[in-house]
Amino acid sequence: ALMQLQARGFVEVRTRKGWYVVEPSIDEARDAFAARRAVEAGMLRDSSLLRDAGKPLQAVIKRLRQHIKDEQAAIAGTDIATRTFLLADFHVCLAECLGHRVLCGLLRDLTARTTLVASLYQSTHDARASCADHARIVSALAEQDVESAAQQMLVHIGDVESALGKSAAAVDPRERLRASLAPLVR
């Protein structure tokens, strides 16, 4: 499993030191966000996916709305890992609901790359904003307005990228380490 993660660029092995999770640079995160914008907006604009998903649209909307409820519960709680996972998994769930299995795998990789950055820098406020964006995207899909859904997705990904960039610039690396270890020190 670690070899597969290494091949995908998520972990690295250091001789005589062990395995480490790769911390993507801001430039690598920007590349992943650019790819996500192209893929996700294109996926939403392909309205044939809504017609050919093999599921009634209402079932798709119901599943996506349940996912958003799960996101809201995680945001209200204290489990940052679950919150971060669910916010990223919305995009994979969306591709899955629209019947696009190939994009599910691609989005898992892309969201994993951006999730690494988000877990370092995303605030609870940013998480709430992302969840609200997801709800707006689903509302546009419920109205069968794929162009609006695609535009909402572009704005959402841009907002997340922008917020992470500002947070990354404002956080001292030592302070970030201190904050991440704070739950362990009592």
PLM features: residue spans?
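C-terminal regulatory/effector modules of DNA-binding transcriptional regulators
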Residues: 123-186
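Short linear motifs at protein or domain termini
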Residues: 1-49, 165-186
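Short alpha-helical functional segments enriched in proximate histidine and acidic residues
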Residues: 46, 93, 97, 163
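Alpha-solenoid helical repeat scaffolds
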Residues: 42, 116-117, 162
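Conserved amphipathic alpha-helical segments that form helical-bundle/coiled-coil interaction surfaces
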Residues: 27, 32, 36, 54-119, ...
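Mobile beta-alpha loop/short-helix "lid" or hinge segments that flank ligand
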Residues: 7, 11-12, 110-112, 126-127
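Short helix-capping/hinge motifs at transmembrane helix termini and TM-loop junctions
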Residues: 48-49, 99, 123-124
